[in-house]
From Swiss-Prot:
Belongs to the Izumo family. The keyword Nucleotide-binding does not apply. This is Izumo sperm-egg fusion protein 4. Residues 1-15 form the signal peptide. GO terms for cellular component: extracellular region; nucleus. It comes from Macaca fascicularis (Crab-eating macaque). Pfam families: IZUMO (PF15005). InterPro entries: IZUMO (IPR029389), Izumo_fusion (IPR052868). It is found in: Secreted. The keyword Glycoprotein applies.
């Protein structure tokens, strides 16, 4: 049995990308797009760089390759955004670059951003797993930028009493879920998500972020 049951609602929506949900994204990327023609000596770099910036959000969702819902906390989204904007602002502080340099740097920042988002989502997931019983944390859906939450059932209980309380809490949670309006309730992800052997109790003690990332990414 997987170490947790993640009860995230699954919503079909157009992909926007996690960074797109940040409050400064529109302002920042509008500036980046409007000043891209000043960053390269070679005119061919301009349309390539412009396309990279325009497709940034959709390409992010395509590259995440996560086997779990793309839900990120506001705190971690702020951390990712700060890192990305800092790299981008530094790149734009320079004058005109030699041919090929500017779009290559944009690709490097993009790849770094994808990695940061993956780790942010996975770290929160692992933290959630290390509780006993039902635990919830607030998130933003990277699919549609709406407020959401992740509810997990963790097996990290230290006594039979804690375990009994955890199981009762899970039963109450499921019972309350069944009472909700079918058209309004979120579908618990443990009904549709696969189990991940790397997250089972025998493997958790020595689980590193790198191992978890490998486990929770789709191939």
């Amino acid at each position: 049995m997987a170490l947790l049951l993640c009860l995230v609602g699954v919503t079909a929506a157009l992909a926007h990308g996690c960074l797109h949900c940040h409050s400064k994204f529109s302002e920042k990327f509008s500036f980046y797009r409007h000043h891209v023609n000043l960053k390269s000596w070679w005119v061919g770099d301009i349309p390539v760089s412009g396309a990279l910036l325009t497709d940034w959000s959709d390409d992010t969702m395509k590259e995440l390759h996560l086997a779990i819902p793309a839900e990120i906390t506001r705190e971690k989204l702020d951390q990712v955004a700060t890192a990305v904007y800092q790299r981008m602002d530094q790149l734009y502080q320079g004058k005109m670059y030699f041919p090929g340099y500017f779009p290559n740097e944009l690709r490097n920042i993009f790849r770094e951003q994808v990695h940061l988002i993956q780790n942010a989502i996975i770290e929160s997931r692992l933290d959630c797993q290390r509780h006993c019983g039902i635990f919830q944390y607030e998130t933003i859906s990277c699919n549609n930028c709406t407020d959401s939450h992740v509810a997990c059932f963790g097996y990290n209980c230290e006594s039979s009493e804690q375990w009994e309380s955890a199981v009762q809490g899970l039963l109450n949670y499921i019972n309350n879920w069944h009472k909700q309006d079918v058209s309004m309730r979120a579908t618990p992800a443990f009904l549709v998500s696969p189990a991940f052997r790397c997250l089972e109790p025998p493997h958790l003690a020595n689980l590193t972020l790198e191992d978890a990332a490998e486990c929770l990414k789709q191939h």
